[in-house]
Amino acid sequence: MVREEITGSTQTLEWKCVESRVDSKRLYYGRFILSPLRKGQADTVGIALRRALLGEIEGTCITRAKFWNVPHEYSTIVGIEESIQEILLNLKEIVLRSNLYGVRDASICVKGPRYITAQDIILPPSVEIVDTTQPIANLREPVDFCIELQIKRDRGYHTELRKNSQDGSYPIDAVFMPVRNVNYSIFSCGNGNEKHEILFLEIWTNGSLTPKEALYEASRNLIDLFLPFIHTEEEGTSFEENKNRLTPPLLTFQKRFTNLKKNKKGIPLNCIFIDQLELPSRTYNCLKRANIHTLLDLLSKTEEDLMRINSFRMEDGKLIWDTLEKHLPIDLPKNKFSL
């Protein structure tokens, strides 16, 4: 049997957005194409991007609400139409946009009679509401209504077992998934030896980011996932050559800054925030995810601690070191973060 050899297209791989629309404040749609792809590649890329878009994109949600003088979540409050459980469900639906990391506090404090909407939430500066008209409760009488809220940025779907709260604090099941749905389809074209595939990708988001932004973030997450394999290849080493090799002890930032901390005690390291270092967004986000907010937080970490951070690379460590040398008015040691 003679097998016909089929080659892929030699054209440059390109992607573009062919349709973009805003159906509502909480529903954005985008349609993209990627081509030309060799046979089988479109399915590989489509599956990977769909999983990354649905499971790896971070979102911001209200995760906890604290009411005053409320015995349990099924209670009703005089003058308020909704029960506590209904209010919690309404808070769960609030769509937020932010670049915060860690837990932040928010609140609602109003006096009836009036309708309470998402616009009445008092938020930290780094958080904004996508749809301010989302309903929360209806105050039918002139009563005071105050809630303390917790806001968090994360990924995936988080549930917490509800218990009878003694202080009126109740968890809210959080859906940290700004991408609502993803579909992909494949179209084959070409004749003979020039057959190739076109990948069509449809993305729906909740308005906290656009489909294009979601596609970019998902792509970056996939790239970061495969970077360790690329670095191994660049090093040109094999398992056989390294299996008996002793790993040298990791250098620490503490050692490099020992003299700094001794001789520069007047520098308020806890007042220098990492966003002042003008780091690239990828490196900055890695540090923020690890709750590293100030220079003091950074210098308290060993190189081993930093390498445990998800998506943190050796290049990030060198970049941080070079940035400190460039921007901070201090005498730094000459030995740099080694690659």
Curated annotation (Swiss-Prot):
E.C. code: 2.7.7.6
Protein origin, superkingdom: Eukaryota
Domain-level remarks: The N-terminal domain is essential for RNAP assembly and basal transcription, whereas the C-terminal domain is involved in interaction with transcriptional regulators and with upstream promoter elements.
Catalytically driven reaction(s): RNA(n) + a ribonucleoside 5'-triphosphate = RNA(n+1) + diphosphate
Assembly and interaction partners: In plastids the minimal PEP RNA polymerase catalytic core is composed of four subunits: alpha, beta, beta', and beta''. When a (nuclear-encoded) sigma factor is associated with the core the holoenzyme is formed, which can initiate transcription.
Annotated protein name in UniProt: DNA-directed RNA polymerase subunit alpha
Family, similarity comment: Belongs to the RNA polymerase alpha chain family.
Region (Alpha N-terminal domain (alpha-NTD)): 1-233
One GO MF term attached to the UniProt entry: DNA-directed RNA polymerase activity
Compartments, record wording: Plastid, Chloroplast
Species of provenance: Saccharum officinarum (Sugarcane)
Function: DNA-dependent RNA polymerase catalyzes the transcription of DNA into RNA using the four ribonucleoside triphosphates as substrates.
Region (Alpha C-terminal domain (alpha-CTD)): 266-339
GO CC annotations on file: chloroplast; DNA-directed RNA polymerase complex; mitochondrion
Primary location recorded for the protein, binned into one broad class: plastid
Sorted UniProt keywords: Chloroplast, DNA-directed RNA polymerase, Nucleotidyltransferase, Plastid, Transcription, Transferase
Classification via SUPFAM superfamilies: C-terminal domain of RNA polymerase alpha subunit, Insert subdomain of RNA polymerase alpha subunit, RBP11-like subunits of RNA polymerase
A GO BP entry: DNA-templated transcription
